[in-house]
């Protein structure tokens, strides 16, 4: 499996520029805080791990950030856009793509069709036609087709291009999810346990894809229980417990925090 770096739509190199900013996020259920004053930022070209024990508020946080859940208060900035409490569809159109613990694919569509749909996610065909005419729209379609073939080859999915996505193995569906990211050209990625249930070879392949996306200027928020993969992949980590951020820094540093040890009941050591 080759690197996906060359396959990405061109993005300006702006490493260090804030891509995602979360400020004082709060959400309660039945009066019980699930997310309580969470604030963090991620820069372009940075991979940040979000870890914590079960019930720490990680899932609620990423659901809010990706538009799947509304917050009670707080603010979320995606680049220069305020995406607070905007729908998942709107958030995706603005450049934030999310994967899930269990890979989600459009089962009735073929592998190639899944990728093509992702490629049109950030573009409005009617607007393209109105502004630039049919010739420009056709050029964009040809570009999508070219990227499609490159990505299928890179992910070793060429032989499955016409296969219905619903019959793929779990690992193949995970690859297809990442292929859709490559097609979409998203600038911020929220990856929810991408290494869960995959073998070491597949884990390494996914890490290579994530690294290529980072090299291309993507900002990545990685939610993961596999601490070895987190240490190998992330620039820094954020640790949550009881709805709050309790530590932030390198994994080597935060795992020695007494508060982190207490939250994990010793499992983080």
Label every model-predicted segment.
Residues 230-232:
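A short, surface-exposed alpha-helical micro-motif characterized by mixed small hydrophobic
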Residues 127-160, 208-211:
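Conserved ABC ATPase "signature" region
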Residues 66:
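Helix-to-loop junction immediately C-terminal to a conserved catalytic motif
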Residues 189-193:
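Catalytic Walker B motif of ABC-type/P-loop ATPase nucleotide-binding domains
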């Amino acid at each position: 499996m080759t690197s996906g770096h060359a396959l990405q739509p061109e993005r300006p190199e702006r490493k260090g520029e804030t891509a995602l900013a979360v400020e004082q996020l709060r959400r309660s259920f039945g009066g019980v805080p699930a997310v309580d004053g969470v604030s963090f930022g991620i820069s372009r070209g940075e991979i940040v791990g979000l870890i914590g024990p079960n019930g720490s508020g990680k899932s609620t946080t990423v659901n809010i950030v990706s538009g799947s859940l509304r917050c009670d208060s707080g603010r979320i900035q995606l680049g220069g856009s305020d995406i607070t409490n905007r729908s998942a569809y709107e958030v995706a159109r603005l450049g934030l793509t999310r994967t899930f613990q269990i890979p989600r694919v459009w089962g009735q569509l073929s592998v190639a069709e899944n990728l093509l749909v992702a490629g049109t996610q950030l573009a409005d065909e009617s607007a393209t036609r109105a502004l630039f005419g049919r010739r420009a729209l056709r050029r964009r379609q040809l570009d999508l087709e070219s990227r499609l073939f490159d990505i299928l080859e890179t992910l070793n999915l060429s032989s499955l291009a016409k296969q219905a996505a619903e019959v793929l193995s779990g690992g193949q569906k995970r690859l297809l999810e990442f292929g859709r990211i490559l097609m979409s050209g998203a600038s911020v990625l929220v990856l929810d346990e991408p290494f869960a249930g995959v073998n070491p070879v597949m884990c390494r392949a996914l890490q290579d894809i994530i690294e290529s996306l980072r090299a291309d200027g993507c900002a990545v928020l990685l939610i993961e229980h596999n601490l070895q993969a987190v240490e190998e992949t992330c620039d820094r980590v954020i640790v949550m417990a009881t709805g709050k951020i309790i530590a932030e820094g390198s994994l080597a540093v935060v795992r020695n925090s007494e508060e982190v040890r207490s939250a994990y009941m010793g499992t983080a050591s």
